[in-house]
């Protein structure tokens, strides 16, 4: 009888330990939170994608190409570059229905904006879509074009003059400047 109570106690203690560890994983992002998130993201993002040598998202079957608008004074053009904050690493993925009149410009083409943005390397959300959306909602612009060229985990040296990411970014800006003025 006493052996039975000890075994029951250990089973209950183990269940409680697992339960509280599970709470810690969810609340405090303990291991294996990152592993679980990566597996979850594999199933959430169901599209055909292509990346370039910098790891930037250059094609996604989820992105719908549209005609690029002509530049005018009610068209905003925002450029985002740098590390993770501009590289599709934020938690919230914006969908087209959340971003009215927000356009993702990449490689001379325009797409209905949605997360992750073409031109950056992550597979999640970013801040630039929300900023563009607020500019449209407040009536500052009728439409906003966003250009994202962020690469997460890069050093400042890589973005410095003469280095690989600097050359890539200059090419992005040169391409953009043929059609638009950055506002």
What are these regions (language model features)?
Residues 111-182:
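Conserved SGNH/GDSL esterase-like catalytic core that processes O-acyl groups on lipids
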Residues 1-127, 138:
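N-terminal secretory targeting modules
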């Amino acid at each position: 009888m006493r052996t039975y109570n000890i075994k029951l106690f250990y089973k209950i203690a183990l269940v409680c330990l697992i339960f509280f560890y599970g709470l810690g994983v969810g609340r405090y992002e303990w291991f294996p939170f990152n592993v679980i998130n990566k597996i979850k993201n594999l199933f959430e993002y169901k599209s055909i994608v292509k990346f370039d040598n910098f790891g930037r998202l250059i094609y996604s079957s989820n992105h719908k190409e549209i005609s690029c608008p002509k530049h005018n004074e009610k068209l905003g053009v925002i450029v985002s570059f740098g590390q993770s904050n501009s590289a599709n690493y934020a938690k919230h993925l914006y969908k087209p229905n959340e971003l009215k009149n927000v356009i993702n410009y990449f490689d001379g083409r325009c797409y209905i904006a949605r997360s992750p943005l073409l031109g950056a390397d992550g597979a999640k959300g970013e801040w630039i879509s929300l900023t563009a959306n607020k500019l449209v909602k407040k009536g500052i612009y009728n439409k906003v074009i966003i250009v994202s060229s962020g690469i997460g985990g890069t050093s400042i040296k890589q973005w410095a003059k003469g280095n690989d990411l600097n050359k890539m970014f200059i090419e992005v800006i040169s391409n953009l400047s043929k059609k638009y003025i950055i506002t």
